[in-house]
Design a protein with these regions (language model features):
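C-terminal motif of bacterial Sec signal peptides marking the signal peptidase cleavage site
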Residues: 17-20
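Sec-dependent N-terminal signal peptides
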Residues: 7-13
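Positively charged n-region of N-terminal signal peptides that target proteins for export
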Residues: 1-5
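Short, surface-exposed interaction patches in beta-rich subdomains
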Residues: 40-48, 99, 103-112, 160-290
Length: 290
């Protein structure tokens, strides 16, 4: 009887300890353990942030799983979950900048939890900068006012959504991917002037459809990568292959015709209300056009 009581007490103690811990499994099957901490913070909207200039939004993350969405209730609202103090993200807000980053100071590089849930205002124009190392990010900027985007991905995966027409003109959209993957949906809704794509050992799927009436330009510099483009149907399309080293081009769109080995145009070129020019520099890369 005594032994049964002792075993029951030990089992209860173990359950209490487990309740205070986080256990996750990564893709390789390794177990993640640590005490889970949580931090919430909200910065309310006020007139001091309405300067008439775009607000800078800087996200700088390491080993994170991050979700970005919009809010109409505050300037920024964050919820962080982390299993190591060294991973704790820091939120800093000035009159012209929202900055979030985690520094990895003193971290031993074991497996850990570092989750971001970030909501940013849809009331102000934003200049978005993202730096992601060994991270998994989901950015839904459909209802935000996006002036520009500059994303650097290193050994990371990203999904970006632009499901609604941008409320302000976007100057540029730049993505630099190194050993990473990115899926971009509805990029045409941004109404960008120039999209710059720099890919090295990466896989990119870019949906250029969406509503806008601006001419645009896409510049691709890809090395040992796979790039897939989905084209809008309401634009004149011209594709120019500036450099072509041990690469392949797959045209899976009946609208696109070949003018030469390095130039393609859409049917009835010159009749659409806007144009999209695509310039590609390819090295050991597969470019697919749909």
């Amino acid at each position: 009887m005594y032994r049964r009581v002792l075993l029951a007490a030990l089992a209860a103690a173990v359950m209490v300890l487990l309740a205070a811990c986080v256990f996750e499994f990564d893709n390789a099957g390794g177990m993640v353990a640590g005490t889970l901490k949580e931090h919430r913070e909200t910065v309310e909207m006020s007139d001091k942030y309405k300067t008439g200039k775009p607000m800078e939004l800087n996200l700088d993350m390491d080993m994170a799983k991050a979700v970005l969405d919009s809010t109409d209730e505050s300037l920024v609202d964050v919820k962080f979950s982390y299993s190591s103090k060294a991973l704790k993200p820091e939120l800093k807000v000035d009159e012209d900048e929202i900055r979030i980053r985690n520094r990895l100071e003193g971290y031993s590089f074991g497996k850990a939890v570092n989750n971001w849930d970030v909501k940013v205002t849809d009331k102000l124009p934003l200049e978005v900068e993202v730096k992601a190392d060994a991270s998994d990010i989901r950015l839904d900027m459909s209802r935000m006012q996006v002036n520009s985007i500059d994303a650097e991905l290193n050994a990371s995966s990203a999904r970006m959504y632009f499901d609604e027409q941008n409320k302000v003109p976007a100057d540029k959209f730049r993505i630099n991917a190194d050993a990473s993957s990115a899926d971009i949906y509805g990029a045409g809704n941004l109404g960008f002037d120039v999209m710059e794509i720099d890919a090295d050992a990466s896989k990119l799927n870019i949906d250029l459809t969406g509503f806008n009436q601006k001419d645009g330009e896409v510049r691709i510099d890809a090395n040992a990568s796979s790039v897939k483009l989905r084209l809008p149907e309401d634009a004149d399309i011209r594709i120019v292959i500036d450099n072509y080293e041990i690469s392949s081009i797959n045209i899976n769109n009946d609208r696109i015709l070949s003018r030469s080995e390095k130039e393609y145009i859409s049917k009835n070129y010159g009749n659409a209300v806007r144009s999209l020019e695509i310039y590609a520099d390819l090295n050991i890369t597969t470019l697919t056009v749909e």
